[in-house]
Amino acid sequence: MAVDRLDIDMKTLEDNSDLRQVEFEGEVSEERYQFAVQYDVLEALSTVAPEGDAVAIFRQHLDEIADLGVVALARDPDQEIVVISENDLD
């Protein structure tokens, strides 16, 4: 059985500093979803506070975020926006 993969649409990356998350769209198993990764996750991955550089940090950790997105989606596939939080880290 093939493992689901999150294909992130890089054109949709948006830093929502008010909510402290980077929002984006992605596709898993040919279905499109809205995602957001919290700043806390970006900081845990990079060991750097993401203020002002959140999208750059996101790009540096793209593969890890894609993996975490699949985990977050499996946790609750019916969310309007799938939020990747520290709970999704190993």
Residue spans for each PLM region:
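A short, structured beta-strand/loop element
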Residues: 21-46
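Acidic, low-complexity intrinsically disordered segments
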Residues: 2-5, 49-90
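Short, charged/polar N-terminal "headpieces" of proteins
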Residues: 1-27
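Residue-level preference for alpha-helix termini and adjacent loops
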Residues: 7, 12, 41-44, 88
